[in-house]
Amino acid sequence: MAATKRKRRGDLEVQAKKPKKNRKDAGQPAKQADVAKEAEEEKDRIPGPVCKGKWKNKERILIFSSRGINFRTRHLMQDLRMLMPHSKADTKMDRKDKLFVINEVCEMKNCNKCIYFEAKKKQDLYMWLSNSPHGPSAKFLVQNIHTLAELKMTGNCLKGSRPLLSFDPAFDDLPHYALLKEFLIQIFSTPRYHPKSQPFVDHVFTFTILDNRIWFRNFQIIEEDAALVEIGPRFVLNLIKIFQGSFGGPTLYENPHYQSPNMHRRVVRSITAAKYREKQQVKDVQKSRKKEPKTILPHDPTADVFVTPAEEKPIEVQWVKPEPKVDLKARKRRIYKRHRKLQQKMSRGGAK
């Protein structure tokens, strides 16, 4: 009975197309205005996305870090996970563990690529890009980090959408940059038909080479005029080494322009110390000059060329001794003493 009922009801698509009839309007023909209105709505209606194909590219990226990272690194990791729907997260790794353990973590998480952030001295951040478990891998020093929350740019993109990857033409000039280009393509490009991705392309990742560093930017593509508006985040990758294996092995390339953060801080300290020593030397020279006796220069006759001689006044010689000046205070004291003596005499005479 159930099968016969289903046959009578028909397919769900046919049922959806049939208009519902009310008891009140039973037997009345549909109005032409309503039919025209429905036709216009169907024209304006945006069709849904095309049926997804088969998900063939099974790239999965493990993004995690070591212990001791600061808040900016943590926010950068969250931004990358949000921009890369094919990524996976894991707990922080202990500093005591060796880097080869990450290959086992990738195998357990079913990931074939890894982005690992390694923090040192609570101020230096290193990024490892690795193809697990056979390699190759690259180590970078991360500089100039600016997260999404920090930048507050006007650009925006759909969460889970697929990005375009734009590379500097300089990536094709040198072999180690060509290797890094292929590496970045495999890591940052979202696989087609990924379950967590959206069938839209509305932003672009740009990788630019400047000052022997790789600069990362993320821009929104505006549909109206195809202009670019920056979204974020921003960071700069300074290449250190490229290894043949995953997190180790023979060195394929070493950057000759790389300067470690410790060396950079040492140079800055030496420059400030040199400035301080220079100031102290200037002060010592000034003190020594003050203590030296002044050298008396001989009279230069050419200095008196434009000097006009002053009128000579006659010198008067005083032959008579000048009268002594009257000291008024001493005179008052004498008068006071006389007056006091007279009073004493008078008081004695009256007593007799």
UniProtKB/Swiss-Prot annotation:
N6-acetyllysine: modified positions: K275
Residue ranges constituting the Brix domain according to the UniProt record: 59-248
Keywords in alphabetical order: Acetylation, Isopeptide bond, Nucleus, Phosphoprotein, Ribosome biogenesis, Ubl conjugation
Compositionally biased intervals (Basic and acidic residues): 34-46
Annotated segments matching region Disordered: 1-47, 281-301
Modified positions (Phosphoserine) in chain numbering: S260
Principal location listed in the UniProt entry: nucleus
Keyword Nucleus: yes
Gene Ontology cellular-component annotations: nucleolus
Annotated crosslink Glycyl lysine isopeptide (Lys-Gly) (interchain with G-Cter in SUMO2) location: K159, K313, K321
Entry's Gene Ontology BP terms: ribosomal large subunit assembly; rRNA processing
Record's subcellular location: Nucleus, Nucleolus
Coiled-coil parts of chain: none
GO function term, MF aspect, one: rRNA binding
SUPFAM superfamilies: Class II aaRS ABD-related
PANTHER family: RIBOSOME BIOGENESIS PROTEIN BRIX, RIBOSOME BIOGENESIS PROTEIN BRX1 HOMOLOG
Family: Belongs to the BRX1 family.
Functional note: Required for biogenesis of the 60S ribosomal subunit.
The protein's name: Ribosome biogenesis protein BRX1 homolog
Annotated organism of origin: Rattus norvegicus
